[in-house]
């Protein structure tokens, strides 16, 4: 029986993955900043077949007591087989309109929080003989994306840390899956930070036409089960990842033409 901890579990990809693991009878730990939304997801997970559901609300914009959060999660199900580091925040501002306060907030949520959790979980997983760590990055972590300077930076940074973790601890039984979504129908654009740090408030048209969260969750959970190093999730927008690799000049030109909304 799997024990699975999912951050960013109150909506979108995290919520959809929670339901898939619930249907497998997993023991679930659900974390996000919204206790109310988490309770609703937890209710559905129990109805879907989860053996146990624990709700641990946490605001990742302030990570002062993250060690206590990790300890609570580990103790709740007496160990964790899989952690999905999925919580995140985006933005819709150009470089000029992006304050350093906004950059720091994005980095705190998107980079420092998952890194801190992974570092704190690692010795526990090693003592237990291994474990699986999945982290949600983005195609915006593979090439610069307009109106996403802080967001792209945080996702680029995740690649560096978690690819290193893959290399260092593979032989010790730690499997790291880097999840790279393109456009998926989630609330991330609604809660993205606009100029002044206020929520963007709408789903971007490109995102609205993207893959459903349920379809994304199926791809992601299958990749984690197979121990894949990386999984690309999306549709035609994923072509940019390959264009960047083989035709970087063309990628730079296309990035300038992207409609960022």
Report each predicted region and the residues it spans.
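Residue(s) in the substrate-gating loop at a strand-loop-helix junction
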Residues: 138
């Amino acid at each position: 029986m799997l024990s699975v901890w999912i951050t960013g579990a109150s909506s979108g990809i995290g919520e959809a993955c929670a339901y898939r693991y619930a249907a497998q009878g997993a023991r679930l730990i659900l974390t996000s900043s919204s206790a109310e939304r988490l309770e609703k997801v937890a209710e559905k997970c129990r109805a879907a077949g989860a053996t146990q559901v624990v709700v641990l609300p946490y605001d990742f914009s302030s990570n002062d007591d993250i060690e206590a959060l990790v300890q609570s999660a580990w103790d709740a199900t007496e160990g964790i087989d899989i952690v999905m580091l999925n919580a995140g925040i985006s933005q819709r501002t150009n470089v000029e309109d992006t304050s350093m306060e906004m950059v720091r907030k994005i980095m705190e949520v998107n980079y420092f929080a998952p890194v801190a959790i992974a570092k704190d979980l690692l010795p526990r997983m090693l003592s237990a003989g291994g474990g699986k760590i999945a982290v949600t990055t983005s195609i915006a972590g593979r090439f610069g994306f307009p109106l996403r300077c802080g967001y792209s930076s945080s996702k680029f940074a995740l690649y560096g840390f978690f690819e290193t973790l893959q290399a260092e601890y593979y032989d010790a039984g730690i499997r790291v899956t880097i999840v790279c979504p393109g456009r998926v129908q989630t609330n991330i654009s609604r809660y993205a930070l606009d100029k002044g740090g206020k929520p963007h408030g709408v789903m971007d048209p490109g995102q609205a036409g993207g893959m459903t969260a349920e379809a994304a969750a199926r791809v992601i959970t299958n990749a984690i089960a197979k121990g894949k190093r990386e999984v690309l999730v999306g549709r035609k927008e994923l072509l940019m990842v390959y264009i960047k690799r083989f035709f970087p000049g063309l990628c730079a030109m296309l990035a300038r033409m992207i409609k960022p909304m």
